[in-house]
Amino acid sequence: RYAQMRLAPARLTHCMRWLGAAARCQHIALEHARVRTAFGKPLIQHQGVNFMLADNEIAMHQARLAIRHVAWMLDQGIRARHESSIVKASVSEELFKVADRCVQILGGIGVTNETVVEMIFRDMRPFRLYDGPTEVHKYAIATQLERQGSAFTDPVGW
């Protein structure tokens, strides 16, 4: 029972840690894209690269908001088991994609130990398994939906 009460804060701790790591990857990739040139202009001016950086920013903003929401729920004394599963599943997947896009932007050096991005990318993969893999959380979310429906079917309720 005690372990169950600690799951939501533990999930959030992982999410916060990896949000910071993803932000570090984004910072490194952004600086690289500003300095490195290809075909006569900085990488950041190429649509494929700047769209990846924009996607990263969107994903990290959504992750930050989701984490803050569950943290607020916990501060209010709400167990937030369902919501912490949603956040853990979505944030772990999205932040892994952020790190992957950063590796892509960095090109060859993205997979070497020349930057910390490679280490973060490698270390971030198991994050999708900590405190239960994404599939386990999706199963728990679906089970909750089967029992009680969705919180989003009543837009006034939130």
Show which residues each predicted segment covers:
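Alpha-helical interface subdomain recognition
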Residues: 4-158
